[in-house]
């Protein structure tokens, strides 16, 4: 597997992975994290434009897509409740990670490669996304507290540092 920046040629594959991920989350008891059409092809294209959309490719097939931004200043991470961040150093963020195949270690690989590139990463997930919470903890992310999105929705915040 390899991680690489997404290109316009990847948009359809990434959008399909997001469609399948929304269905997977609904079936797994998490119908509220990604509502409606979010995330979608427009989000992938926006990330391509600012250099933050990535894909994981295996034998020429796009098997995962995600947003990875270095030196982020995510406004929703400025305040954290019921805990604290591990440090106040510059950080990277991972958002919108989704995979085509489950149980093959694809998310673990993506997180590992991101951490090799940047050793201070923040990420959040919905309280009902139990599979992602387990993956985050398995991959060395530590729960830090609760953050609120701009629309007021609550998320569980995690961080992994060197």
Which ranges hold each PLM region?
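Conserved GNAT-fold acetyl-CoA-binding loop/helix
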Residues: 23-42
């Amino acid at each position: 597997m390899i991680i690489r920046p997404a290109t316009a040629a990847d948009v359809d594959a990434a959008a399909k992975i997001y469609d399948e991920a929304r269905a997977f989350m609904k079936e797994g008891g998490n119908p509220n994290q990604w509502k409606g059409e979010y995330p979608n092809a427009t989000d992938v294209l926006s990330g391509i434009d600012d250099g933050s959309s990535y894909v994981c490719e295996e034998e020429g097939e796009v098997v995962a897509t995600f947003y990875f931004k270095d030196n982020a200043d995510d406004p929703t991470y400025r305040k954290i409740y019921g805990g604290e961040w591990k440090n106040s150093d510059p950080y990277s963020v991972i958002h919108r990670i989704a995979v085509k195949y489950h149980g093959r270690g694809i998310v673990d690989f993506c997180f590992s490669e991101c951490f090799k590139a940047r050793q201070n990463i923040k990420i959040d997930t919905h309280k009902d996304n139990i599979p992602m919470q387990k993956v985050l903890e398995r991959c060395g992310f530590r729960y830090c507290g609760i953050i609120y999105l701009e629309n007021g929705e609550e998320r569980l915040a995690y961080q992994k540092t060197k």
